[in-house]
Amino acid sequence: MRTPVRALSPLLAAVAVLASWAVCGTAAAQNCPVQYEQLTKALKESVKASGGPSNGGFDNNEWAVVVTRDGGICAVTMSGGKPTDQWLGSRAIAAEKANTANALSLDKTALSTANLYAGAAPGGYLFGLVTTDPPATTLISAGDPKTYGSASDPLVGKHLGGVVVFGGGLALYNQQELVGALGVSGDTSCADHNVAWRVRHALGLDHVPGGVSPDHNDAIIYDMLPDKTSASGYGHPQCGGSEADVAMQIHAGFVPKWAQVMIK
């Protein structure tokens, strides 16, 4: 007996959608500034839980996400052996951090997500920024959870969007231009920034042309005042561990002399 064409239509539609996802994912991977294997290796070597150094926070496993210059997700990975080795919610946060750093950086000026904290706080000059690009939340839980963090992660090829204004997102630069961005999440935001800094350096995509920190890059700036404002306007609060110490050691952060007593 022949199957009615009408009955086949939903199946054919589903196959077409799956095929389009595969094509999008393949195209995104081809245009990615990093390869999945490179990103995974760099992440594992930058996180204590997977054999790397401490970053001053909880030393949890981490997620890392890279977007292309147009904001499409092209790589998602993790430092643990399975998705539940990391905070599951941090997969989306990492993607949103990457989106933010890419969207707000330029060829000549980098802004890390850490640089946005003070400005986006109530009363700040960027207050309301987090509402400007809501994430496509239906994408976060789509696909097979067992593939999260793999080369075939369902987020690859998608534009999730989202804006995050705390540490962990960095723009990626080759020797000529901005080529995308990296987001890391799974620990304190201060530790996430340190991990992202290490990963970007390991990938060779840290040719930052300029930025708002005193070191003229996108380093995290620990200059929050007692009234919770930032001396520079681009500051980020400390997170309670030794993250600021680590940041200074790896040149990922700037702490004014008056604030250094606060991390002793």
Language-model segments: which ranges?
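Bacterial N-terminal signal peptides that target proteins for export
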Residues: 1-13
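Accessible peptide chain termini
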Residues: 1-3, 17, 167
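Bacterial N-terminal signal peptides
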Residues: 10-22
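Sec/Tat signal peptide C-region and signal peptidase I cleavage site
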Residues: 23-29
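Flexible, solvent-exposed loop/hinge segments and secondary-structure transition points
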Residues: 30-264
